[in-house]
Amino acid sequence: MSSFPVLNVGFSNVVFVSKILTILLADSAGAKRLRTEAKSENRLIDATCGRKTRSVLVLESGHILLSAIRPESLSKRLETGDNHIGEGEEESED
């Protein structure tokens, strides 16, 4: 059986690493524009579970995925291959 590397984007939501094009800071102007366009075109995936959006992932399919995990944490998970949830990464609601 082959292995498919996945990235935990928070709250038990995962995405195939091979499908991720970029990870953006949610507060950037470009990310906000992508989010608005994707919502109007029904291409928006919200994986925040009601928390503040911190990262915007652009997927190969053209979908935009919202995550409550900081881009730095997601990048670290990608680099190390460790999907362990760090203390405080998902619990805070600020």
Curated annotation (Swiss-Prot):
Pfam families: RemA-like. Signal peptide: none annotated. Coiled coil: none annotated. It comes from the Bacteria. InterPro entries: RemA-like (IPR007169). Belongs to the RemA family. PANTHER family: REGULATORY PROTEIN SSL2874-RELATED, REGULATORY PROTEIN TM_1690-RELATED. This is Putative regulatory protein LEPBI_I0950. It comes from Leptospira biflexa serovar Patoc (strain Patoc 1 / ATCC 23582 / Paris).
